[in-house]
Curated annotation (Swiss-Prot):
Entries under InterPro entries matching the protein: Dxylulose-5-P_synthase (IPR005477), THDP-binding (IPR029061), Transketo_C/PFOR_II (IPR009014), Transketolase-like_Pyr-bd (IPR005475), Transketolase_BS (IPR020826), Transketolase_C (IPR033248), Transketolase_CS (IPR049557)
SUPFAM superfamilies, per database record: Thiamin diphosphate-binding fold (THDP-binding), TK C-terminal domain-like
Subunit annotation: Homodimer.
The protein's name in its UniProt record: 1-deoxy-D-xylulose-5-phosphate synthase
Family: Belongs to the transketolase family. DXPS subfamily.
GO cellular component: cytosol
Catalytic activity: D-glyceraldehyde 3-phosphate + pyruvate + H(+) = 1-deoxy-D-xylulose 5-phosphate + CO2
Originating gene: dxs
Pathway assigned to this chain's UniProt record: Metabolic intermediate biosynthesis; 1-deoxy-D-xylulose 5-phosphate biosynthesis; 1-deoxy-D-xylulose 5-phosphate from D-glyceraldehyde 3-phosphate and pyruvate: step 1/1
Keyword Transferase: yes
Protein's job: Catalyzes the acyloin condensation reaction between C atoms 2 and 3 of pyruvate and glyceraldehyde 3-phosphate to yield 1-deoxy-D-xylulose-5-phosphate (DXP).
Length: 620
């Protein structure tokens, strides 16, 4: 969309933070209003993360107004809330391309702008990186400030507290801003509390505070009395005791939608030494009533008509794999009261809404705490229950040691329902489910299943749930199923594939939901087609049979080729000294950028046309 100068006259003056800082303070509320409207107009036309950005407009303006970015380093955690940041940092006219192939990256991305200090997408990384950046600035003698913005969800993760604990120990000069949008502006975020925040962050208070410490440092009883008095005064009006105990100077909570008040507080805090913590209260979806009322639904949106106040309904076609999982979960839980389901803050995305309502006492949302989720599941299994960890492929990476140490070594029957496996689409490099087969396949005695359709997905979930000799995993993609008939649940024989089509000379060994495209290729080339089903244990007998009866083999998977299912086939053939040629088709050795799933599969040669072209070129 072309930028409408008449509609956004103040925003038109700002194409960089240098231009922003030239504006008079009095014009900033108007700028915030225009920025919010522009965000609504652009995202509703292009799709993208929505409600979070609406809630951080004033904070973004205030930070770039007070701090000398990009010299001063501003780090956004996760990045859902960073659309206003992108608009104010030279990318205003491209915001309509966000999350699209070749367009702006969905999250802050170092390769895109000097203003994007840290490439993000996963949560709770900002404070750790910020400490490192602050330490380097201090060692180089640069008067460079470091600011980390983290949300109330991301700060619950253990990594954030590990970082704050370290910051309290080494005391770098840095500011952590907690964007708390868990609730609307509460009563204590009023004039009195804002005034108190400005007072506590001011130079007079800070000077008196530090001076008093020096004067009474040699008189321990008085020093301790003063410390307790200060904590008591703060504690009467602010909830910052935890952060103070971690070594931060806590200020807040303050109104995160008062841009002028934020500027005053940030200016006061800018020159304070040591780790500082500013707690702001915002409303997710601010300025667009439907998003304020339902921020979860409006967290990430497709293209929609803002005047309608609602998002377009799905066409009511085929169910998603997430729904297939959710339906199976409810069906199984109704028959077995030992079933326990765990998710790390992905209830909606993982298809667990209905389960959470029907079985609230067996549903555990552990927040953004993947490590805890896995070891919590281990504890449930030790106690005789049947835990299922529903998790995205990209987030299971964050709990790898727990899978190994707390589940697999102890042979605990934990089922991992791995959603968003393979190419996920618009979220790009940080969210592709490209590696789960590779990092799970090397774990001893792990059972790993790759369904080719929704019925097989259900059967594999059932099989994994009833497997009691150790952990198991079923991986399935983002998107809709293929429309096959759902048959009664039954356990599959572990480690056994099935031949779907008999052909000549060439055998295609397929792992997972690329099966429809692999079937087209097999038909075109008169090749044998095998649904391998199990990545671990592999059906070695079937692989050797295919090697003995065909001139060449092709493996197909939507996982990194390196270390993936195809690598396992290669290992079997080498171990048995079978010299048959093998072509491994899968994800290449680079991080896959954003684009629709269809666009990226076509570009990577993972659709039928691409596979056939690769095979023909290899055979030529």
């Amino acid at each position: 969309m072309s930028f409408d100068i008449a509609k956004y006259p103040t925003l038109a003056l700002v194409d960089s933070t240098q231009e922003l800082r030239l504006l008079p303070k009095e014009s900033l509320p108007k700028l915030c209003d225009e920025l919010r409207r522009y965000l609504l107009d652009s995202v509703s036309r292009s799709s993208g993360h929505f409600a979070s950005g609406l809630g951080t407009v004033e904070l973004t303006v205030a930070l770039h107004y007070v701090y000398n970015t990009p010299f001063d380093q501003l780090i956004w955690d996760v990045g859902h809330q960073a659309y206003p940041h992108k608009i104010l940092t030279g990318r205003r006219d491209k915001i309509g391309t966000i999350r699209q192939k070749g367009g702006l990256h969905p999250f802050p991305w170092r390769g895109e702008s000097e203003y994007d200090v840290l490439s993000v997408g996963h949560s709770s990384t900002s404070i750790s990186a910020g400490i490192g950046i602050a330490v380097t600035a201090e060692k180089e003698g640069k008067n460079r400030r470091t600011v980390c913005v983290i949300g109330d969800g991301a700060i619950t993760a253990g990594m954030a507290f590990e970082a704050m604990n370290h910051a309290g120990d080494i005391r770098p000069d840095m500011l952590v801003v907690l964007n708390d949008n868990e609730m609307s502006i509460s009563e204590n975020v009023g004039a009195l509390n804002n005034h108190l925040a400005q007072l506590l962050s001011g130079k007079l208070y800070s000077s008196l505070r530090e001076g008093g410490k020096k004067v009474f440092s040699g008189v321990p009883p008085i020093k301790e009395l003063l410390k307790r008095t200060e904590e008591h005064i703060k504690g009467m009006v602010v909830p910052g005791t935890l952060f103070e105990e971690l070594g931060f100077n806590y200020i807040g909570p303050v109104d995160g939608h008062d841009v002028l008040g934020l500027i005053t507080t940030l200016k006061n805090m800018r020159d304070l030494k040591g780790p500082q913590f500013l707690h702001i209260m915002t409303k997710k979806g601010r300025g667009y009533e439907p998003a304020e009322k339902d921020p979860i639904t409006f967290h990430a949106v497709p293209k929609f008509d803002p005047s309608s106040g609602c998002l377009p309904k799905s066409s009511g076609g085929l169910p998603s794999y997430s729904k297939i999982f959710g339906d199976w979960l409810c069906e199984t839980a109704a028959k077995d009261n030992k079933l326990m389901a765990i998710t790390p803050a992905m209830r909606e995305g993982s298809g667990m809404v209905e389960f959470s309502r029907k079985f609230p006492d067996r549903y555990f949302d552990v927040a953004i705490a993947e490590q805890h989720a896995v070891t919590f599941a281990a504890g449930l299994a030790i106690g005789g229950y049947k835990p299922i960890v529903a998790i995205y492929s990209t987030f299971l990476q964050r709990a790898y040691d727990q899978v190994l140490h707390d589940v697999a070594i102890q042979k605990l029957p934990v089922l991992f329902a791995i959603d968003r496996a393979g190419i996920v689409g618009a979220d790009g490099q940080t969210h592709q489910g490209a590696f789960d087969l590779s990092y799970l396949r090397c774990i001893p005695e792990m059972v790993i299943m790759t369904p080719s359709d929704e019925n097989e997905c259900r059967q594999m979930l059932y099989t994994g749930y009833h497997y009691n000799d150790g952990p198991s995993a079923v991986r399935y993609p983002r998107g809709n199923a293929v429309g096959v008939e759902l048959t009664p649940l039954e356990k599959l024989p572990i480690g056994k594939g099935i031949v779907k089509r008999r052909g000549e000379k060439l055998a295609i060994l397929n792992f997972g939901t690329l099966m429809p495209d692999a079937a087209k290729v097999a038909e075109s080339l008169n090749a044998t087609l095998v649904d391998m089903r199990f990545v671990k244990p592999l059906d070695e007998a079937l692989i050797l049979e295919m090697a003995a009866s065909h001139e060449a083999l092709v493996t197909v998977e939507e996982n990194a080729i390196m270390g993936g299912a195809g690598s396992g086939v290669n290992e079997v053939l080498m171990a048995h000294r079978k010299p048959v040629p093998v072509l491994n088709i899968g994800l290449p050795d680079f991080f896959i950028p954003q684009g629709t799933q269809e666009e990226m599969r076509a570009e990577l040669g993972l659709d039928a046309a691409g596979m056939e072209a690769k095979i023909k070129a290899w055979l030529a």
